[in-house]
Amino acid sequence: MKEEFKKKEMSEKIIMLLESSCKDFKGIKTAYAEACAELRSKFEYTDRIIEYNNCIAAYETELAFEQGIKDNLNYFNNPNKILSDAHYSVLENIIRQKTKSIITERQKLVKLLPASLIPAYDAVIEYTVFLDTYIPKLAHYYGFVYGNKNNYNPDSEVCKKYREWLSTYLGIEPEGENNALL
């Protein structure tokens, strides 16, 4: 893979796409920021939890992007193969294995949260779950499309169907005017 791909940058760009394209995300992100501010003032490990969450998002982006490229090549070599939701199950397993230790460390800190801060932490969970849902799917799609640039005749119809499915599934346009990822 080319050096130009930087996992943290791409996860930040996906978050920017969500901010501009997904009506639900703005409220979730605002609640997350407010919860983080409250948690920071009352819980000393908040910044470490946030860093773990950012690290997980970056790994999700990197792994999904790479898997998208691999799936594109696999599709190129086996054009009768159909892209399906099963790709995401495989991807989720890969991500789970790679982020397991980070999640374990984060959970150790979360267990230290005083009961009075659990309601504030719920907004952190909602934000994290939102990213866990959107980032791998979008990054996989971008990897799949990026794989078309590897000097072969891409099947643009498959990419179009993938984009249409993803747009319907996530409720956003992955190649919209605010998207600087492709």
What is the predicted role of each segment?
Residues L181-L182:
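Hydrophobic/aromatic hotspots within intrinsically disordered, low-complexity regions
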